[in-house]
Regions:
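ABC transporter nucleotide-binding domain
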Residues: 166-251
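Catalytic Walker B motif of ABC-type/P-loop ATPase nucleotide-binding domains
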Residues: 151-155, 160
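ABC-family P-loop ATPase nucleotide-binding domains
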Residues: 82-138
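A short, flexible loop at the N-terminus of ABC-type nucleotide-binding domains that lies
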Residues: 1-24, 30-31, 36
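The feature captures the beta-strand-to-loop junction immediately N-terminal to the Walker
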Residues: 38-40
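Helix-to-loop junction immediately C-terminal to a conserved catalytic motif
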Residues: 53
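Conserved ABC transporter NBD signature motif
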Residues: 60-73
C-alpha cells in the first residue's frame, strides 16, 4: 500500500465570518510527483499550502501529509512561504547554521551552500540587506538543506529574474529527482511550471477544478474546430466560442467526433485558461473509488 504524499478529503477553510477560502476539496497526490498548484490570485492556493504545512487548521474536512497529521509530519516537510519569513538580523551564514541546528541528523550542508553560492551571496551579509530574489535563494537553501520528503513552495520564483529562475528550477528538479522528493509548488503563471511538473491541481473559487497527472488530463480533453452551430450536446463542454462560421471548443469527448471536425490536444495553458474562464464547467477530479485505490 503506497501512502500518498498529500491527501485531502472534503477539506475547507473559512476565516472568521468571511467567505470560504477553500471548500469541499478532495484529492490525492502520489509520492514522488512534481505538482503544480495553479489558479488566479485569491483562488486559495496559499491557504491550501498553509494547511498542508500545518500552519492553519481546517474548518472542515481533513488533510494528511505523508500519511500523518501535518503537525506530526513537520520534520519531514520543507515549506517556503510566499513572504519568505527569515530573521533579518542574522547573516546568511548564521541562517544556514540555524538550519543545521534545527535539523540535527538530516541537514545537507553541501546542498544548502550550493543553493546560496549560485547567487554569489556574501555569507556575512545580513538578511535585511538582501534583495527579494536573494532572500528567496536563502529560503530555498533552508528548505532543500532539510532534505525533506515533501517540499511545499508558495510562488517560489516570483522574486527571481529569468536567469536565476531557470538556474534554481533546474537545481530544484535535480534535487527532487535524485532524492525522490515530492514537490508541490504554486503559481498563477502556468508557463513557469508546465515544463517541470507532471501533476496538476487547478484551484478556482476555493474549489479543486482539475486534479491528476498532466498527461492524463490533457488526453481527456480535445480542442475542436467545427462549423458554427455544430452540436456539442453529447460531450462535456469546458469552453466554446463562435467566430463567424467557425466554432472552437475545449471538450471532454463522450464518443467519436465527426470526420469534418478538426481536433488537437490543448496545451496545458489553454486547458487551464478554459476552466478558469468558465467557472460553471464541470470539474475533473478522480472518482472516490479511484482515490481509495490509489491509497
Amino acid at each position: 500500500m503506497t501512502v500518498p504524499a498529500l491527501e485531502a478529503d472534503a477539506l475547507g477553510k473559512r476565516f472568521g465570518r468571511r467567505s470560504w477560502a477553500l471548500r469541499d476539496c478532495s484529492f490525492r497526490l502520489p509520492a514522488g510527483r512534481v505538482c503544480a498548484v495553479v489558479g488566479p490570485n485569491g483562488a486559495g492556493k496559499s491557504t491550501l499550502l498553509a494547511l498542508a504545512a500545518g500552519l492553519l487548521a481546517p474548518t472542515e474536512g481533513t488533510v494528511r501529509v505523508l500519511g500523518a497529521h501535518p503537525a506530526a509530519a513537520r520534520s519531514r516537510v520543507g515549506f517556503v512561504d510566499q513572504d519568505k519569513p527569515l530573521y533579518p538580523q542574522l547573516t546568511v551564514a548564521e541562517t544556514l547554521r540555524m538550519g543545521a541546528d534545527l535539523n540535527p541528523g538530516h541537514w545537507d550542508a553541501d546542498t544548502a551552500r550550493r543553493v546560496v553560492a549560485g547567487g554569489d551571496l556574501d555569507p556575512d551579509r545580513r538578511i535585511r540587506a538582501l534583495s527579494g530574489g536573494q532572500r528567496t535563494r536563502v529560503a530555498l537553501a533552508l528548505a532543500l538543506g532539510k532534505r525533506p520528503e515533501l517540499l511545499l513552495l508558495d510562488e517560489p520564483m516570483a522574486d527571481l529574474d529569468p536567469l536565476a529562475r531557470h538556474e534554481l528550477m533546474g537545481l530544484l528538479m535535480g534535487e527532487a529527482a535524485a532524492h525522490g522528493t515530492t514537490v508541490v509548488m504554486s503559481s498563477h503563471v502556468v508557463a513557469e511550471l508546465e515544463d517541470s511538473c507532471d501533476h496538476l491541481l487547478l484551484v478556482g473559487g476555493g474549489k479543486i477544478r482539475l486534479s491528476g497527472d498532466i498527461d492524463d488530463l490533457l488526453a481527456a480533453h480535445t480542442w475542436v474546430t467545427a462549423p458554427a452551430g455544430a452540436d456539442l450536446a453529447a460531450h462535456e463542454v469546458v469552453e466554446s466560442r463562435t467566430t463567424g462560421r467557425q466554432l472552437s471548443a475545449v471538450i471532454r469527448p463522450s464518443g467519436p467526433l465527426p470526420d469534418d471536425w478538426r481536433t488537437t490536444t490543448p496545451s496545458l495553458e489553454d486547458l487551464v485558461l478554459s476552466y478558469l474562464r468558465n467557472p460553471a464547467a464541470p470539474a475533473l477530479t478522480p472518482a472516490p473509488e479511484t482515490l481509495e485505490a490509489a491509497v
